[in-house]
Every structure is written in C-alpha cells, then in structure tokens.
C-alpha cells in the first residue's frame, strides 16, 4: 500500500483546487469514481439510482482542468506524480477486477 494524494482542479479557476489523501492507489481510484458519482447525483437530484459506463467516467476526468496523483515510493522516499491517463488506466484495471469478482 502506497500513500496516495489526489490533486483535483475542477475548473480553470485556481481557487477551486483541492486534494484528498488515501492509504493506497486503489482507494484513490475508488475516490475518483465516488467523486464522479457525487457529480451525477448533483446533476440528477431526483433520480433514485445512478448508473454510468466507463466512457462517461473518462469523459468527466478529461473535462476536469487538472487531475493528478502523487504516489509515495518507499524506495526513494519521494512522491511520484501521475497524470490523467495513468489514473484512467488504473481505474480501468480496478473496475475490470471488480466486474470479474462480481461475475464469479
């Protein structure tokens, strides 16, 4: 498990920047999914349930002004930066694994 910091800038306005920290990369990726789900709930307040596919999630990520991760590396005792493409790849792997486990 590597401590992970998620940096989020929803719009071009720098005062909207925020961050969240997680105990692992997977927890962070789940946090990104939850952030999108909260966005969907705000956009559809009267909907009893929220459903989406991965392409919609990726479009949401692409529409953010900035989204990046800093992942702690114990070997160098530094944080390694990662961009949106890396985040989308990790989310894809996480969701595919969850779908496979649900199908068992």
Curated annotation (Swiss-Prot):
Expressed in all tissues examined. Pfam families: ER. The keyword Cell cycle applies. Keywords: Acetylation, Cell cycle, Isopeptide bond, Nucleus, Phosphoprotein, Ubl conjugation. It comes from the Eukaryota. It is found in: Nucleus. GO terms for molecular function: methyl-CpG binding; RNA binding. May have a role in the cell cycle. This is Enhancer of rudimentary homolog. It comes from Homo sapiens (Human). The gene is ERH.
């Amino acid at each position: 498990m590597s401590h992970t910091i998620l940096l989020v800038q929803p719009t071009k306005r720098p005062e909207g920047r925020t961050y969240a920290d997680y105990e692992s990369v997977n927890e962070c990726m789940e946090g990104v999914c939850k952030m999108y789900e909260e966005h969907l709930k705000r956009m559809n307040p009267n909907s009893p349930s929220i459903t989406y596919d991965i392409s919609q999630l990726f479009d949401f990520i692409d529409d953010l002004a900035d989204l990046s991760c800093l992942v702690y590396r114990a070997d160098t005792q530094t944080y390694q930066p990662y961009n949106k493409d890396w985040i989308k790849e990790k989310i894809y792997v996480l969701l595919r694994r969850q779908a496979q486990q649900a199908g068992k």
